[in-house]
Amino acid sequence: MKNKKLLILIFALLGIILAACGGSDEPAEDQANEEGTTAEESADSDSGFPMTISPTVTSSQNRDGSETYTFEEVTFESVPERIVVFDYGFLDTLDALGVEGIVGVAKDSSLPAHLEKYSADEYGNIGTLKEPLLEDIAALEPDVIFISGRQATFYEQLKEITPNVVFVGTVDDDYWNTFLASVDIAAKLFDKEAEAEEYLAKIDSALEEINALAENYDTSLVTMYNEGELSGFSTNSRFGYVYENYGFKPVTEDINASSHGSNFGYEAILDFDPQVLFVIDRTAAVSGNSNIKEDIENDIIKQTTAYKENRIVYLDGPLWYLSGGGLQSELAKIEEVLAELK
């Protein structure tokens, strides 16, 4: 009898314990899962950091080759929230990707029209492309400063403001690859890889179209117009991507590499006689006033195949000379050529 009462007591206690365990509105396992999810969300927000970013190039020289500047990798502990940008191509890419947090830009007279909104007072003025306002930049307390060739001489001084100074510029002899490298920097650092892939897909599609178009012509020449004078560019130049990436065949490779091209007389254009003649209007880009058609379409040029077959392609000066190196501007260049030659 005593044993029977003892068993009843044990079963009663077990029932109370089981009821207590099952009485919670939310199972203990679910509670643990919720806590785990919160931890995972926190981890996701910091995924990829610390992140080491490499410059688009590790060194560059000034125009006369007398000085060499070396650029270092930068390790970021988190996504930069206060961004200062000198390079307009990189600003173009940040704008295309919808990156927020830009606090300062170079408010130079050469600020591209499609980036005009950054001239507003809400964006701090960090000087010109050649003359940074170091004290004003320091006052912005940036987490990162993005530079290109014209600021190379100020690299060490800018690093005194923040160690996070990244070279994102393009270089003449490897323009397209350095452009893509700069896009990769923006996409990874600001978690915009999906947006970058979408934009690059548009560029790839446009490149396919322009390469197909370029197959129709055997020779071409890229030139730049400046106050009545012409200079020419081949594959080893800042506009070499017209040949290498767009697919146009150069009429000659024998042109000295220079950021402003090799001086050409109009007679040289007639001698080369390219089927397509590209003319970038530097005068319009720099001064806003240009007599390009009157100067180019002279009696000598009127004898060329390009003139006779209406294939002198006048390219937008501000876009080609001052802009470029960004997602929006590179797509716009391709679309301009397509519109002129289709």
Predicted regions and their residues:
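Bacterial Sec-exported substrate-binding components of ABC uptake systems
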Residues: L6, G22-G89, A194-L221, S287-N291, ...
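A short, structured surface patch at a secondary-structure boundary
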Residues: R82-D136
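Bacterial N-terminal signal peptides that target proteins for export
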Residues: M1-I8
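Extracytoplasmic substrate-binding proteins
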Residues: Q157, I161-E227, W320-K342
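Alpha-helical, coiled-coil/dimerization segments enriched in small aliphatic residues
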Residues: S109-H114, S234-G261
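Structured C-terminal subdomain patch of bacterial secreted/periplasmic proteins
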Residues: R82, K188, Q275-K342
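Proline-aspartate-enriched helix->loop->beta-strand connector
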Residues: E141-I147, P163, I269, D273-L277
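C-terminal motif of bacterial Sec signal peptides marking the signal peptidase cleavage site
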Residues: I17-A20
